[in-house]
């Protein structure tokens, strides 16, 4: 079964290698075809460029000729205008001379006029008329020639303009063709690059398949060698067994029963000893061969895994390159979208007048009354103090700047001490969500009261609260809790000092000098009410 499976694997590997080779050959043929097409396109591009150069040279020549013709036309126009101006001047001069002569003739006497030779004048007039006629005809001829030349030049100019337009159209067409060819060339180059990558992958896969095929062939050879060696060893063992059987039969026949048995037992012991030795040697050889095979298989697996990792790394690099391209395109698109949005906003919302300044914030509401049990957390503290009268500890607090030592101050100190002990031992205060919801926070800076509430909440969160199974009796605070609480109180005291330097010195309590003392268990209701009133007043003074 194993040999059949290996043969099937070998066949599949051979089929895959053949398929890979066929695909490789087909890709090579396609590559050659694409190369030929690229060469043809390059030749066509060169021809188009040559034609473009010819068209450009012809167009430059045509432009030069047109410029020269235009210059000649301008010169002829200037000459004609000058000739016409001179002719008009001569006509005016002749008219003025005729008028003057007529005036002089009217002033002269009849005798003088008769003496003047009229024939000479007639001859002169005839000559002048002939000269004028000749000059006017000549001018007409020159003008007609110039007009003919102008018409010819204009016709040539029109033809040259038509030729220029045609050449420009051809240039635009050739440029479009060049752009198309360049685009096709880029596409072909990209396809060839991709095909080269595919060919490289196919080569690697084919090498991988060939390596697997070689490894399978080596495994088959090793298995065949081992099988042949095992068959030879088994055949030799059978021959030796047959020989031993024959020898034992001969010995049994020739020697007596006792001696034969002894000899047979001795031979059997020696044979078993040798057989065990050979079996152990054979097992060691088999183990060594198996270790060699395993090591070779592990090496092959390692090489295969390394190749697979190389392929995966290349694919990962390709995907990373594509990802970076996609990210750059996405960034460009986002930038364009943002610009378009800004333009749309500018078009839809024209710039208006500057908005009016915001109204001033409303004044903060007055603080809640201290006697309300729902909004004041100290009332909950005092209720807990009333319920739990088993607590027999007391802290003596020394106030700063205390000039009068009255019983009210002692009660205050006791209340504050008991409150601090409760805070140390983890008394759970009620949430102050109602007061925070009622009072709307303004744009002011955080005051000392807010910082004090936040510090109390942080202390309550950090201090370990007693579980439901713990006894209600007093528990001594741990040194870590005491150090944390002392730090928090020190910070609170510094904040209060900075906020209220000299406004209320009697309310600032030195909380560093804390001492644990026993409190009297029996207290009447009047003392409790005074204690409640004093504690609420102290806390409201410190929080306000």
From Swiss-Prot:
It is found in: Perikaryon; Cell projection, Axon; Cell projection, Growth cone; Cytoplasm, Cytoskeleton. Residues 499-544 have a biased composition (Polar residues). It comes from the Eukaryota. Residues 343-544 are annotated as: Disordered. Residues 17-100, 141-184, 259-349, 480-504 form a coiled coil. GO terms for cellular component: axon; axonal growth cone; cell leading edge; cytoplasm; filopodium; growth cone; lamellipodium; microtubule associated complex. Residues 372-383 have a biased composition (Low complexity). Keywords: Cell projection, Coiled coil, Cytoplasm, Cytoskeleton, Developmental protein. InterPro entries: Shootin-1. Residues 397-412, 481-497 have a biased composition (Basic and acidic residues). GO terms for molecular function: actin filament binding. Residues 352-371, 469-479 have a biased composition (Pro residues). GO terms for biological process: actin filament bundle retrograde transport; axonogenesis; Cdc42 protein signal transduction; cytoplasmic actin-based contraction involved in cell motility; endoplasmic reticulum polarization; netrin-activated signaling pathway; neuron projection morphogenesis; positive regulation of axon extension. Involved in the generation of internal asymmetric signals required for neuronal polarization and neurite outgrowth. PANTHER family: SHOOTIN-1. Belongs to the shootin family. This is Shootin-1. It comes from Danio rerio (Zebrafish). The lineage of its organism: Eukaryota, Metazoa, Chordata, Craniata, Vertebrata.
């Amino acid at each position: 079964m194993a040999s059949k499976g290996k043969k099937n694997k070998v066949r599949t590997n051979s089929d895959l290698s053949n398929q890979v080779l066929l695909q490789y050959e087909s890709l090579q043929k396609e590559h050659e075809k694409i190369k030929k097409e690229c060469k043809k396109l390059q030749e066509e591009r060169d021809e188009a460029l040559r034609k473009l150069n010819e068209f450009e040279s012809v167009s430059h020549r045509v432009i030069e000729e047109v410029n020269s013709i235009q210059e000649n036309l301008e010169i002829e126009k200037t000459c004609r205008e000058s000739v016409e101006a001179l002719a008009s001047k001569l006509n005016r001069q002749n008219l003025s001379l005729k008028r003057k002569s007529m005036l002089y003739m009217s002033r002269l006497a009849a005798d003088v006029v008769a003496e003047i030779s009229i024939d000479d004048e007639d001859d002169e007039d005839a000559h002048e008329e002939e000269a004028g006629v000749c000059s006017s005809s000549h001018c007409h001829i020159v003008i007609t020639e110039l007009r003919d030349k102008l018409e010819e030049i204009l016709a040539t100019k029109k033809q040259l303009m038509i030729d220029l337009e045609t050449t420009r159209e051809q240039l635009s067409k050739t440029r479009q063709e060049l752009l198309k060819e360049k685009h096709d060339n880029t596409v072909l180059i990209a396809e060839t690059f991709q095909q080269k990558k595919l060919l490289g992958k196919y080569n690697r896969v084919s090498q991988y398949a060939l390596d697997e095929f070689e490894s399978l062939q080596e495994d088959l050879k090793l298995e065949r060698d081992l099988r042949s060696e095992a068959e030879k060893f088994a055949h030799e063992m059978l021959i030796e067994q047959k020989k031993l059987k024959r020898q034992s039969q001969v010995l049994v026949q020739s020697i007596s029963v006792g001696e034969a048995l002894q000899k047979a037992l001795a031979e059997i012991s020696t044979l078993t000893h040798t057989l065990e030795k050979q079996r152990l040697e054979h097992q060691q050889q088999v183990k060594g061969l198996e270790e060699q095979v395993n090591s070779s298989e592990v090496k092959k697996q390692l090489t295969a895994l390394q190749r697979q990792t190389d392929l995966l790394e290349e694919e990962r690099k390709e995907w990373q390159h594509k990802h970076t391209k996609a990210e750059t395109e996405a960034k460009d698109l986002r930038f364009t979208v943002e610009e378009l949005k800004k333009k749309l906003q500018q078009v839809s919302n024209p710039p208006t007048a500057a908005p009016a300044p915001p109204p001033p914030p409303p004044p903060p509401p007055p603080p809640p009354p201290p006697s309300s049990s729902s909004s004041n957390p100290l009332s909950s503290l005092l209720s807990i103090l009333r319920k739990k009268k088993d607590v027999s500890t007391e802290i003596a607090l020394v106030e700063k700047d205390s000039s009068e030592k009255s019983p009210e101050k002692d009660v205050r100190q006791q209340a504050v001490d008991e409150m601090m002990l409760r805070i140390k031992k983890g008394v759970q205060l009620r949430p102050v969500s109602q007061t925070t919801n009622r009072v709307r926070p303004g744009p002011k800076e955080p005051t000392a009261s807010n910082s004090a509430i936040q510090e109390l909440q942080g202390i309550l969160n950090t201090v370990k609260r007693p579980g439901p199974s713990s006894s209600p009796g007093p528990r001594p605070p741990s040194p870590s809790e005491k150090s944390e609480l002392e730090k928090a109180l020190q910070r609170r005291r510094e904040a209060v000092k900075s906020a209220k330097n000299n406004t209320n010195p009697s309310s600032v309590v030195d909380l560093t000098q804390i001492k644990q003392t026993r409190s009297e268990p029996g207290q009447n209701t009047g003392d409790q009410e005074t204690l409640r009133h004093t504690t609420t007043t102290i806390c409201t003074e410190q929080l306000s």
